[in-house]
Amino acid sequence: MAKVVICGASGRMGQTLGRMVAESQDLELAGGIDLHPGSFFGAEIVAAKEIEALLASKKPDVLIDFTVAHAAVENVKSAARNNVALIVGTTGFTPEQREVMATAINGHVPAVISSNYSVGVNIFWQLVREAGRLLKDYDIEVIEAHHRNKKDAPSGTAKTILQILDEEAGERRKLYGREGMMERQNEIGVHVIRGGDIVGDHTVMFSKNFETIELSHRAYDRSVFASGALRAARWVVGKKPGIYGMNDVLGLEKT
């Protein structure tokens, strides 16, 4: 039975993950990390400054991180120092932060890093890749919507979409929203919506004269992300050190 520690335990994803781990038959909830201590589905949440002590005492097999970028970098370094495998679902990293994490991980521990752990989203990315390859001469727009409390924009999932489109349809200027008089150039329009309790909506629109193709994914509950993250957690334990993606977990082509 794999022992799991969850960073960001008091957050929306942390609570969903904690409940699902506690209810599972093959995972054990070893504890949580957050800003303030508290109870956590039969385990305990300890303050972030106590992460090293928790990892040393509980000796978990895997640490799952859904926090914010600067905290996640430190959590990754702590896990690597304690030989704990990683699932990183935090988004909004700078290139420099990604480099710091890669240095900590490579040669030390296995880690799955993904901007979205939903199985459906990973299939959606594959469809976007194929459409981008075949529809290079179409106008492309990306629209994403999330709840009012999501801080990073565009979302990590949308950034992955843009990366895929650059690879398959050719690099284009990214135009974030539109205002005023302008002619369309070699660009991808990117539109961000924040409001209410929207879990996560993503649409890629390919348009040409007389037709439009839309690819969309809509999440209705955070459990789809948590389920994928736990699938990755089960998979990553015992793997060779290095950075993996959900494509590796699911046996898909690179996304």
Curated annotation (Swiss-Prot):
Matching Pfam families: DapB_C, DapB_N
What positions constitute the catalytic site? H146 (proton donor/acceptor), K150 (proton donor)
Q: Does the keyword Acyltransferase apply?
A: no
Which Gene Ontology BP terms does the record give?
diaminopimelate biosynthetic process; lysine biosynthetic process via diaminopimelate
Q: What is its EC number?
A: 1.17.1.8
Task: Name the catalysed reactions.
Answer: (S)-2,3,4,5-tetrahydrodipicolinate + NAD(+) + H2O = (2S,4S)-4-hydroxy-2,3,4,5-tetrahydrodipicolinate + NADH + H(+); (S)-2,3,4,5-tetrahydrodipicolinate + NADP(+) + H2O = (2S,4S)-4-hydroxy-2,3,4,5-tetrahydrodipicolinate + NADPH + H(+)
Which residues make up the binding site for (S)-2,3,4,5-tetrahydrodipicolinate? Answer: H147, G156, T157
The kind of enzyme this is, by top-level EC class, is oxidoreductase
Q: Name one GO molecular function term.
A: NAD binding
Q: Tell me the residue numbers annotated for binding NAD(+).
A: G8, A9, S10, G11, R12, M13, G89, T90, T91, S114, S115, N116, Y117
Alphabetical UniProt keywords: Amino-acid biosynthesis, Cytoplasm, Diaminopimelate biosynthesis, Lysine biosynthesis, NAD, NADP, Oxidoreductase
What's the main place this protein lives?
cytoplasm
Q: Which InterPro entries match?
A: DapB_C (IPR022663), DapB_N (IPR000846), DapB_N_CS (IPR022664), DHDPR_bac (IPR023940), NAD(P)-bd_dom_sf (IPR036291)
Q: Which PANTHER family match?
A: 4-HYDROXY-TETRAHYDRODIPICOLINATE REDUCTASE 1, CHLOROPLASTIC-RELATED, DIHYDRODIPICOLINATE REDUCTASE
Function of the protein: Catalyzes the conversion of 4-hydroxy-tetrahydrodipicolinate (HTPA) to tetrahydrodipicolinate.
Q: Which family does it belong to?
A: Belongs to the DapB family.
Spell out the protein name for this chain. Answer: 4-hydroxy-tetrahydrodipicolinate reductase
